[in-house]
């Protein structure tokens, strides 16, 4: 989703995929081939890469920076294997729902920076409030309770095994 990307050649990537496939020892290990060609070379070259990567043995294709439903659909129509969609905020792709992606034929969706952005925004807001007010009383409502934290990390269970 960044500008000014440089691509390795299709042939070089195909070779990398073939090497990865040959080295694969666990049938549950997936070779996921990413292509950033759309933002550099356009959709037609992306389709060429998708087909070449599948032919090289990739288990899944990760077409990066599809702009809209139409581009996601074009890739699906030209791909034979599983597809991964990247829904990162502030990127080049229109943010689609899980249901939309399923309807478009995508198998996996990732939200690679969503939780980090949520957490850091809350941290920033909280620290600004503490700096301004001189205390954290006004941000406690935004915090996870101790009880919930302990539930999430199964704190009580960990004490049993000590």
Can you say where each PLM-predicted feature lies in the sequence?
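Gly/Pro-rich interdomain helix-loop hinge
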Residues: 142, 147-157
């Amino acid at each position: 989703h960044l500008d000014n990307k440089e691509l390795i050649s299709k042939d070089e990537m195909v070779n990398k995929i073939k090497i990865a496939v040959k080295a694969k020892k666990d049938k549950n290990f997936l070779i996921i081939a990413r292509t950033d060609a759309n933002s550099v070379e356009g959709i037609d070259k992306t389709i060429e890469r998708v087909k070449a990567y599948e032919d090289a043995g990739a288990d899944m294709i990760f077409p990066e920076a599809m702009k809209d439903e139409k581009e996601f659909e074009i890739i699906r129509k030209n791909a034979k294997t599983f597809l991964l969609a990247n829904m990162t905020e502030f990127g080049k792709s229109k943010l689609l729902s899980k249901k939309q992606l399923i309807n478009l034929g995508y198998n996996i969706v990732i939200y690679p920076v969503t939780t980090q952005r949520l957490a850091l925004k809350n941290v920033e807001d909280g620290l600004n409030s503490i700096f301004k007010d001189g205390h954290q009383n006004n941000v406690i409502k935004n915090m996870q309770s101790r009880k919930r934290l302990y539930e999430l990390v199964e704190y009580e269970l960990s004490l049993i095994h000590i």
